[in-house]
Regions:
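Electrostatic cytochrome c docking/interface patches
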Residues: 38-66, 177-209
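Inter-heme linker and motif-flanking segments adjacent to c-type heme-binding CXXCH motifs
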Residues: 81-83, 123-128, 153-162, 195-200, ...
Length: 303
């Protein structure tokens, strides 16, 4: 799911959060957020070092552009020199930073970059803000190495990092679990589940599918997102139900990924992050398809 759009989803739930209580509740949640974000996590640095192997570098480039979603315009940008600033008023101002060798890529060691991907913590051991590490920290060490190695090949960009601030409302939404801003708090650091080697199976597809739940819900049946703005597009059902993918073929699914066109000929809303999906390779597409068609069929809206 595109990251800034998750903010739009969560902002819609603000009235519900406010209705839970008065100033005391606000203070408690803001204080809890600040305390959590100031925590220093003492994770050892993974023993991962960059590689110059062309195959490793190619794998890293692919992951950055596809499953990682890093190169999206609303993330780090096509050249990874930093994304556009998304201003959400009193909720937050978010800018994905420059991660080339002219930015954070030079400030972090290989191990620190690997730890960031696996545990969602910065160089100083404190939590990242907003980056969806919980959707990609299943990548095995060799894939993490590939990403780190690719970052080391990026051109030096002197582009300055944009603002990254979280307002009172954003802190409340995070503590209400309506929006993930405090990244490290959401990760099970002691039992990190790692994907098997890439293969066109539902077993591997389950990990890829983690990136779908933000919009389509835990059951993948779609439907209106609770508290979302009225003008936000409604996520589709992507389970094998009659209201979802029943009757679809793998060819239909590939057309959706490549052209953004549904089986019925209708185009997807731009809300769907097609710039990342279109770069998925055949193994990833088949794995995700096999997974989506294996999950329990749920009627549309049973999120």
């Amino acid at each position: 799911m595109k990251l800034w759009k998750k903010i739009l989803v969560a902002v819609g739930g603000l009235l519900g959060v406010a209705a839970l209580g008065g100033g005391g509740l606000v203070w408690m949640r803001v204080s809890a957020y600040d305390s959590s974000m100031s925590q220093v996590y003492a994770f050892a640095l993974p023993k991962i070092e960059r590689s110059t192997d062309p195959l490793v570098l190619a794998r890293g480039k692919h992951l950055v552009e596809s499953l990682g979603g890093c190169a999206a315009n609303d993330c780090h940008g096509a050249d990874l020199s930093g994304g556009k600033t998304i201003s959400m008023g009193p909720v937050a101002t978010i800018t994905a930073p420059n991660i080339t060798l002219g930015g954070l890529g030079a400030a972090y060691s290989d191990g620190e970059l690997a730890r960031l991907i696996q545990h969602g913590v910065k160089k100083d051991g404190r939590s990242l803000t907003f980056m969806p590490v919980h959707e990609i920290n299943w990548l095995p060490d060799n894939d993490v190495q590939a990403i780190v190695s690719h970052i080391r090949t990026l051109s030096d960009s002197a582009k300055a990092n944009g603002p990254m601030t979280v307002g009172l409302i954003g802190k409340m939404l995070d503590q209400s679990d309506a929006l993930i801003l405090d990244v490290a708090r959401r990760i099970d650091h002691n039992h990190r589940e790692v994907a098997p080697p890439p293969e066109p199976t539902k077993k591997y597809g389950r990990f890829i599918g983690k990136g779908c739940t933000g919009c389509h819900g835990a059951t993948l049946s779609g439907g209106p997102i609770p508290g979302a703005p009225a003008d936000m597009p409604i996520p589709s059902n992507i389970t094998p139900d009659a209201t979802g993918l029943a009757g679809w073929t793998f060819a239909d699914f590939e057309k959706l990924l490549d052209q953004g066109v549904r089986k019925n000929g209708k185009k997807l809303d731009p809300f769907m992050p097609l710039e990342s999906l279109v770069t998925m390779n055949e193994i990833e597409r088949k794995a995700l398809w096999d997974y989506l068609t294996s999950v329990p069929a749920k009627e549309f809206g049973n999120r």
